[in-house]
């Protein structure tokens, strides 16, 4: 039996993966995110698809692994989580973890949350702990951080790094709309005052005013994980201006299948590969199902399939 690829964490052996067309240098490195199927914990987000259908569609597309997704979508205990994923031939990468680290009074609580999640990820074979720096756990509108705030955050991130290392994980910082690392100014402060690895999210960087291609070229050495997300900039601008909430923007189609938005996905991947990046690329097109569940074999699976087709036809031919 082939051994899992060390550069991707817990990839499945290649001969166990369904082949749906070559991805060249990206074979075995493209993974799924439940949000691409509309799975989100935000009240009023939309219809939630059953986990068995989502996992089955991931497997049908030949995706070898997934992030955890919203609370309640997958079991949050072992061995239940690994057993469920195993039925669909999927490995666990890790997942998205909101933490409050700018307030020293909440540090102990944040570290306790981080430890609990790290234990779950480790037990399930995960390798990536994706930190989002929220204002609070209700996702209140963030207060733009100062340099002093970010120095405090940096101290907290180092403590989370230690927790992750003790559980065989790599922490990556996720710039994200609605967090304290949202805008180009926030990203610059975080780069200057923290030494954490990064999750390069092409969509959220673009929305925040950061060119993801330039980020990949300049900071590729700090990238430990990647979310591939395309964006309709016109809709994103309405979110940034406050005309639309993030949820309204998603429901209006702000995030698009790869190759149908305004992000230079191919240039970003090429820059990352040239920087030496060897990790996962997670397909993450946030959607909201607002008109009920789609018929079997239709709906989100079509968009994810289109993302894979984009990688095969547009990105892979540009890679060595």
What are these regions (language model features)?
Residues 7-9, 20-21, 87, 106-199, ...:
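Active-site acidic/histidine proton-transfer and metal-coordination neighborhood
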Residues 21-27, 55-60, 74-94, 112-126, ...:
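Acidic (Asp/Glu)-rich catalytic clusters
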Residues 28-37, 66-68, 92-97, 129-131, ...:
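Hydrophobic faces of well-ordered beta-strands that scaffold small-molecule active sites
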Residues 32, 65-66, 154-262, 315-318:
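Acidic/histidine-rich catalytic cores of soluble enzymes
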Residues 32, 58, 66, 85, ...:
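Conserved, mostly hydrophobic/aromatic
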Residues 35-37, 69-71, 97-102, 134-136, ...:
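Active-site beta-loop-alpha junctions enriched in small/polar residues
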Residues 36-50, 101-110, 142-149, 257:
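Active-site mouth loops of central-metabolism enzymes
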Residues 65-82, 138-140:
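Glycine-rich, proline-tolerant flexible connector loops at the mouths of alpha/beta enzymes
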